[in-house]
């Protein structure tokens, strides 16, 4: 299903909520209401405008595991538990997205103490960027009270491709000192109610959805479970919140001020009675004084709580100015944007929908002929002197673009190959905006997506190259030249040298029987080989990149009919050769390309004053004739 690019669209995360037998034993008859209360708080976090997307977390199924059922294996290892749960939930999920029982993601709540590699401080685990992958869109959460809502939101944030706020990619986006107060903090204590999601989290989920990875979230569920709308503190007082966090013998420590900011609970630790905290605030709605209740970690008068009950939908602000062009020549991209700030949505109100980031082409003129490298080559070459990338590589590398074997969905990643070693790596998750998607394509990369553009480098243009590689031409400026070759001898033989400027090259080997014995080869003007030289053959299909960023598609030596094809135009002469390694029978090589027609010389136009000059000459001739008659 095609969706609008760079648009804010309502997403519905249909969620399967599962609780294991330890949850059932701890919570008893109140388990279902507790789980829905936790999910309501998690859904509220996803409705906050700081995430900058309309994300609706809905519960479509709730399963409580019991004895006698085939259940996932839940144990101390968080990684093993996650793997087991992901496998189990996939078998429970109907594959058809329109099925009412289908879900987009699954989350397991357990009272099992989960452990990571070195410590048992883990509160959950999930894969990153897996939301529409039925086998991996899953998460596990260790229940430790109502604050588990933020653990659930945190793990689902990973499912939406969010990283921890202290990660390197988030450093520039978040700024200094802001990595500990958001949902995606590596260790959560108090989440800022005014901005639960960091700028990095908002950027990552936006890019993730803009790149089409949330396609399964566009359908609205028919009959989701109703989540509680009352503040959780009304159903679970401070004592009960302590019991949910520290165990049934715990109670609230009322003597520790200030109220609401952090929940302190009485209990026993290592045999000593003491007050302890996990630094989470009291749940919203918890009574904190006469006619007072907590909200966002503050103790407010109950009349003020009404302001938090009324949803306010957001509205788009004005369009901003067009930004800088991503390129100075050769076809760049520039953006404008608008924000959902007129007004900002509040209290779970609807986030703005519609296009938020339009873009257009800019600086489409050709780059100077002195530019030795293509735009993608420049981006790869920027890593040539980086010695910190791979410890096993001795010194600087000569990085060049890699096209062969790169899937179409990965065309806009900066995949580069170390020329000397042949290894290739994704050096950047996306190329610069305006980079051609491939050597023979007019389409360009925009924010990591391949966007259609015409041969005039205008995004959305329908102009195409003709056979002569004239943009918008009618094919009249060139003519087809064809030939064949069948005088084969052992070793390499020249077939034809194709001059520079030729377009739409096609070479095809035809006929033959028995074992394959001849192969195509390409030799450059400097004598080096671009394909199948030095008796080394390319077995599979590949893009042969020639000087000037011209690409020819080679079928591979194992193809039944060996072919070479490409649009051109060639920047340098190219010699087509055949390598004969056996006794070819009934084999013929055919080739064709298009040659520019000679431009007819334009007759010299008469001078602008030719009528006056003609009159003057006629007058001179008339006078001479008259004088001759005298």
Curated annotation (Swiss-Prot):
Protein name, UniProt field: A disintegrin and metalloproteinase with thrombospondin motifs 4
Localization of this protein: Secreted, Extracellular space, Extracellular matrix
GO biological process terms on file: defense response to bacterium; extracellular matrix organization; proteolysis
GO CC terms in record: extracellular matrix; extracellular space
Catalyzed reactions per annotation: Glutamyl endopeptidase. Bonds cleaved include 370-Thr-Glu-Gly-Glu-|-Ala-Arg-Gly-Ser-377 in the interglobular domain of mammalian aggrecan
Cysteines engaged in disulfide bonds, as pairs: 86-138, 115-120, 132-216, 170-200, 242-265, 253-275, 260-294, 288-299, 325-362, 329-367, 340-352
The protein's role, per its UniProt record: Cleaves aggrecan, a cartilage proteoglycan, at the '392-Glu-|-Ala-393' site and may be involved in its turnover. Also cleaves COMP. May play an important role in the destruction of aggrecan in arthritic diseases.
The TSP type-1 domain, residue ranges: 313-368
Source species: Rattus norvegicus (Rat)
EC numbers for this chain: 3.4.24.82
Tissue note: Brain specific.
Propeptide residues per the UniProt entry: 1-5
Domain comment as written in the entry: The spacer domain and the TSP type-1 domains are important for a tight interaction with the extracellular matrix. The spacer domain is also required for cleavage of COMP.
Active site: 155
Taxonomy of the source species: Eukaryota, Metazoa, Chordata, Craniata, Vertebrata
Primary residence: secreted
Binding site for Zn(2+): 154, 158, 164
GO molecular function list: metalloendopeptidase activity; metallopeptidase activity; peptidase activity; protease binding; zinc ion binding
Residues covered by the Disintegrin domain: 233-303
Subunit note: Interacts with SRPX2.
Ion transport is among the record's keywords: no
Keywords from the UniProt entry: Cleavage on pair of basic residues, Disulfide bond, Extracellular matrix, Glycoprotein, Hydrolase, Metal-binding, Metalloprotease, Protease, Secreted, Zinc, Zymogen
Record region (Spacer): 479-630
């Amino acid at each position: 299903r095609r969706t609008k690019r760079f648009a804010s669209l309502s997403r519905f995360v249909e969620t399967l909520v599962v609780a294991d037998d330890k949850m059932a034993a701890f919570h008893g008859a109140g388990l279902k209401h507790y789980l829905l209360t936790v999910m309501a708080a998690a859904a509220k976090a996803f409705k906050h405008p700081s995430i900058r997307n309309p994300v609706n977390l809905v519960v479509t199924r709730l399963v409580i595991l019991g004895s006698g059922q085939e259940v996932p294996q839940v144990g101390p290892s968080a990684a093993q538990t996650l793997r087991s749960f992901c496998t189990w939930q996939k078998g429970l999920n109907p594959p058809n997205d329109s099925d009412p029982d289908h879900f987009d993601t699954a989350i397991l709540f357990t009272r099992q103490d989960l452990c990571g590699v070195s410590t048992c401080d883990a509160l959950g685990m999930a894969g990153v960027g897996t939301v529409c992958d039925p086998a991996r869109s899953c998460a596990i959460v260790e229940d430790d009270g109502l604050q588990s809502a933020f653990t659930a939101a945190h793990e689902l944030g990973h499912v939406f491709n969010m990283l921890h706020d202290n990660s390197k990619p988030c450093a520039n986006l978040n700024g200094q000192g802001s990595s500990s107060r958001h949902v995606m903090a590596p260790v959560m204590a108090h989440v800022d109610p005014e901005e639960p999601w960091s700028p990095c989290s908002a950027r990552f989920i936006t890019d993730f959805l803009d790149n089409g990875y949330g396609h399964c979230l566009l359908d609205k569920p028919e009959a989701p479970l109703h989540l509680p709308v009352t503040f959780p503190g009304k159903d679970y007082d401070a004592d009960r919140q302590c019991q949910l966090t520290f165990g049934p013998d715990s109670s609230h420590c009322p003597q520790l001020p200030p109220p609401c900011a952090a929940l302190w609970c009485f209990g026993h630790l290592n045999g000593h009675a003491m007050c302890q905290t996990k630094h989470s605030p009291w749940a919203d709605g918890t009574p904190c004084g006469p006619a007072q209740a907590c909200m966002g970690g503050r103790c407010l008068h109950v009349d003020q709580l009404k302001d938090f009950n009324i949803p306010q939908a957001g509205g788009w602000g004005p369009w901003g100015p067009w930004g800088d062009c991503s390129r100075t020549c050769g076809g760049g991209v520039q953006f404008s944007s608008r924000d959902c700030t007129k007004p900002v949505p509040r209290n779970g109100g609807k986030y703005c929908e519609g296009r938020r980031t339009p873009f257009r082409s800019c600086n489409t003129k050709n780059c100077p002929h002195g530019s030795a490298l293509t735009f993608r080559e420049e981006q790869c070459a920027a890593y040539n002197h980086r010695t910190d990338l791979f410890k096993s590589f001795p010194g600087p590398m000569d990085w060049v673009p890699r096209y062969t074997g790169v899937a179409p969905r990965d065309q806009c990643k900066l995949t580069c190959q170390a020329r000397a070693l042949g290894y290739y790596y994704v050096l950047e998750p996306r190329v610069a905006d305006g980079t051609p998607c491939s050597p023979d394509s007019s389409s360009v990369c925009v924010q990591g997506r391949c966007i259609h553009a015409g041969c005039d480098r205008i995004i959305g243009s329908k102009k195409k190259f003709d056979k002569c590689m004239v943009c918008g031409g009618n094919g009249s400026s060139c003519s087809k030249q064809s030939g064949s070759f069948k005088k084969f001898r052992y070793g390499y033989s020249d077939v034809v040298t194709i001059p520079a400027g030729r377009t739409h090259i096609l070479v095809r080997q035809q006929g033959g029987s028995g074992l394959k014995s001849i192969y195509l080869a390409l030799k450059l003007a400097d004598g080096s080989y671009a394909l199948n030289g030095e008796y080394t053959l390319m077995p599979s299909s590949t893009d042969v990149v020639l000087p000037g960023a011209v690409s020819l598609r080679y079928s591979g030596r194992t193809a039944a009919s060996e072919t070479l094809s490409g649009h051109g135009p060639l920047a340098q002469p190219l010699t087509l050769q055949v390598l004969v390694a056996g006794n070819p029978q009934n084999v013929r090589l055919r080739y064709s390309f298009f040659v520019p027609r000679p431009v007819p010389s334009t007759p010299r136009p008469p001078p602008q004053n030719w009528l006056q000059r003609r009159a003057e000459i006629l007058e001179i001739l008339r006078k001479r004739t008259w004088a001759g008659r005298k």
